[in-house]
Amino acid sequence: MLHALRQAKAQATATVAARVGIGGPVGSGKTALIEALIPVLQRRGVDFAVVTNDLVTKEDAERLRRSGLIDPDRVSAVEAGACPHTVIREDPTLNIAAGDELEARFPGVELILFESGGDNLASTFSLDLVDWWIFVIDVAGGDDIPRKRGPGLLRCDLLVVNKIDLAPHVGVDLDRMLADARQVRGGKPVIATNLKAGTGVEAVADAISAAVLFRI
């Protein structure tokens, strides 16, 4: 179904790149996930670009540009100036325009990652903006986060539980947290990551590739 929708969209507009959202609370590891994905996607030959969102700065975009991991021109920044979810859900015009501009500058781009500003468990992406989206939480927030549910955690296409290496240091029962996450999501995918060590990054890249790039 998603493949058919992408084909219809490409035929109706000049937009051909798959668009993937990455949301989650402040400090959960959204930018770190992108940094970890960049070399994996490059190694796989994926032509991609990134759009970041911050409230009143371009901090995350500048971090990626300075990283040396990606051509700085392939990173665009949106300053939300309001609640982070406003520009990815209620009115994603700025992000849509940023994605369109990247596609115009890089005609071969096949994937654009949209990182939302840090938000809460209610944050979701408009399907006018993205084709598929990831929500990132981390164990430092407590192993009860999945049981609190929230639209972001429940509706995302992929839930990433990050910083699993910290579980013993913050008193989190990781096995229970992951089991609860899988239960409340009704079988939708959950991937555990330690981005510092690279744990789980290949699995996230595999999920993106299978879902929107149609590569197995």
Swiss-Prot record:
<keyword id="KW-0963">Cytoplasm</keyword>
<keyword id="KW-0996">Nickel insertion</keyword>
<feature type="binding site">
    <location>
        <begin position="24"/>
        <end position="31"/>
    </location>
    <ligand>
        <name>GTP</name>
    </ligand>
</feature>
<comment type="function">
    <text>Facilitates the functional incorporation of the urease nickel metallocenter. This process requires GTP hydrolysis, probably effectuated by UreG.</text>
</comment>
<dbReference type="GO" id="GO:0005737">
    <property type="term" value="C:cytoplasm"/>
</dbReference>
<dbReference type="InterPro" id="IPR027417">
    <property type="entry name" value="P-loop_NTPase"/>
</dbReference>
<protein>
    <recommendedName>
        <fullName>Urease accessory protein UreG 1</fullName>
    </recommendedName>
</protein>
<keyword id="KW-0547">Nucleotide-binding</keyword>
<dbReference type="GO" id="GO:0043419">
    <property type="term" value="P:urea catabolic process"/>
</dbReference>
<dbReference type="GO" id="GO:0016151">
    <property type="term" value="F:nickel cation binding"/>
</dbReference>
<dbReference type="InterPro" id="IPR004400">
    <property type="entry name" value="UreG"/>
</dbReference>
<dbReference type="GO" id="GO:0003924">
    <property type="term" value="F:GTPase activity"/>
</dbReference>
<comment type="subunit">
    <text>Homodimer. UreD, UreF and UreG form a complex that acts as a GTP-hydrolysis-dependent molecular chaperone, activating the urease apoprotein by helping to assemble the nickel containing metallocenter of UreC. The UreE protein probably delivers the nickel.</text>
</comment>
<dbReference type="Pfam" id="PF02492">
    <property type="entry name" value="cobW"/>
</dbReference>
<dbReference type="InterPro" id="IPR003495">
    <property type="entry name" value="CobW/HypB/UreG_nucleotide-bd"/>
</dbReference>
<comment type="similarity">
    <text>Belongs to the SIMIBI class G3E GTPase family. UreG subfamily.</text>
</comment>
<keyword id="KW-0143">Chaperone</keyword>
<dbReference type="GO" id="GO:0005525">
    <property type="term" value="F:GTP binding"/>
</dbReference>
<keyword id="KW-0342">GTP-binding</keyword>
